[in-house]
């Protein structure tokens, strides 16, 4: 006769078998739904692509008709209505496509291959965006503290290398995460994307710059600038995140909009006090570029890193300054 303990084990196994049957059935249904989902995604993507092509052709035809024929007022109004409806339809397709798999861009393809990075629910998209914002905040604070230590406590090329390596890793990670967010509907584009690629290059060159007279002549200026930049980025995150939250609640901003290291039109209400901080930082970038160009002409300058750091600082200044200036100019034009 079996012992009570063995009988309990047999009974438990029987219960596990029943649960196992349920698990198998659930998993079968799950795989079936996945196959159905893949078919729906393919069909939806194809239909949207065809519609977008037709809309593009229609826009071209309307433009040609408007420019070639002297239209009566009624026709002009009809063309305006059609163009407006086309723009609305394009925005709707943009929203739809953010939930559909898409081919990765060149950068993501090089880094991740052909892995699908599209998140399929609003919750997962927002969670990833929120995690990205927290990552920026925490790393900005760490970089601010580390730049302070390197500037005022430890004068060592080793700690400087650690700081520069952290900058390279930080900006590389930002570019990857931003590319994933763009694939999922975030509308960060233009200069604010390119800005981080340039920062990655600049940090990499700073990391390879050997210790010497030229490095020591620029070191304190660079670390002081890094401290100030981290401080301004912290201010921007703190105030932009609050502003974005209010605008999302009012339905004036998209859920996937991100904080940026600059000034955009939506920041005009409540965030104009940041402009002096931004302009000061941008002219500091110009000052860094001028300093490096002067060092490049120094008789003892032999390092290629000097000129290769000066150029990115100059590009940073031009991009940041004129992008900010354009936003301010457009806002004043609208008000007038």
UniProtKB/Swiss-Prot annotation:
Tagged with keyword Membrane: yes
A cellular component annotation (GO) from this entry: plasma membrane
Keywords, in A-Z order: Cell membrane, Endoplasmic reticulum, Membrane, Nucleus, Transmembrane, Transmembrane helix
Source organism, top-level taxon: Eukaryota
GO molecular function (one): coenzyme A binding
List of residues binding CoA: 129, 186-187, 236, 239-240, 331
Residues in the Cytoplasmic compartment per record: 1-131, 177-189, 240-269, 330-336
Subcellular location(s) of the protein: Cell membrane; Nucleus inner membrane; Endoplasmic reticulum
Keyword Flavoprotein carried by entry: no
Biological role: Multifunctional protein involved in mechanosensation, and plays an essential role in lipid metabolism. May function as a potential ion channel involved in sensing mechanical stimuli. TMEM120A is structurally similar to a lipid-modifying enzyme, ELOVL7, and contains a bound coenzyme A molecule, which suggests it might function as an enzyme in lipid metabolism.
Similarity section: Belongs to the TMEM120 family.
Protein name: Transmembrane protein 120A
Gene field: tmem120a
């Amino acid at each position: 006769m079996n012992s009570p303990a063995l009988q309990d084990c047999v009974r438990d196994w029987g219960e596990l078998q029943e649960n196992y049957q349920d698990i198998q059935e659930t998993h079968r249904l799950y795989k079936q739904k996945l196959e159905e989902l893949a078919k729906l995604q393919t069909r939806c993507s194809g239909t949207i692509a065809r519609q977008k092509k037709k809309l593009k052709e229609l826009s071209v035809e309307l433009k040609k008709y408007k420019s070639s024929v002297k239209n009566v007022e009624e026709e002009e109004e009809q063309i305006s209505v059609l163009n407006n409806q086309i723009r609305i339809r394009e925005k709707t397709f943009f929203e739809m496509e953010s939930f559909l798999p898409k081919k990765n861009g060149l950068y993501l393809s090089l880094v991740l291959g052909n892995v699908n990075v599209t998140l399929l629910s609003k919750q997962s998209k927002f969670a990833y965006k929120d995690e990205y914002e927290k990552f920026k905040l925490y790393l900005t604070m760490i970089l601010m503290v580390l730049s302070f230590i390197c500037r005022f406590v430890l004068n060592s090329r080793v700690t400087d290398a650690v700081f520069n390596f952290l900058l390279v890793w930080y900006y590389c990670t930002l570019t990857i995460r931003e590319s994933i967010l763009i694939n999922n509907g975030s509308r960060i584009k233009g200069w604010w994307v390119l800005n981080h690629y340039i920062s990655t290059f600049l940090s990499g060159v700073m990391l390879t710059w050997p210790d010497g007279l030229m490095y020591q002549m620029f070191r304190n200026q660079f670390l002081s600038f890094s401290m100030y930049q981290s401080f301004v980025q912290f201010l921007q995150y703190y105030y932009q995140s609050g502003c974005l939250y209010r605008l999302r609640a009012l339905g004036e901003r998209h859920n996937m909009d991100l904080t940026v290291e600059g000034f955009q039109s939506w920041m005009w209400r409540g965030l104009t006090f940041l402009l002096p901080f931004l302009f000061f930082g941008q002219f500091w970038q110009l000052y860094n570029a001028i300093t490096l160009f002067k060092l490049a002409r120094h008789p003892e300058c032999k390092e290629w890193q000097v000129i290769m750091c000066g150029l990115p600082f100059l590009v940073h200044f031009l991009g940041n300054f004129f992008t900010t200036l354009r936003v301010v100019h457009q806002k004043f034009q609208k008000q007038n």
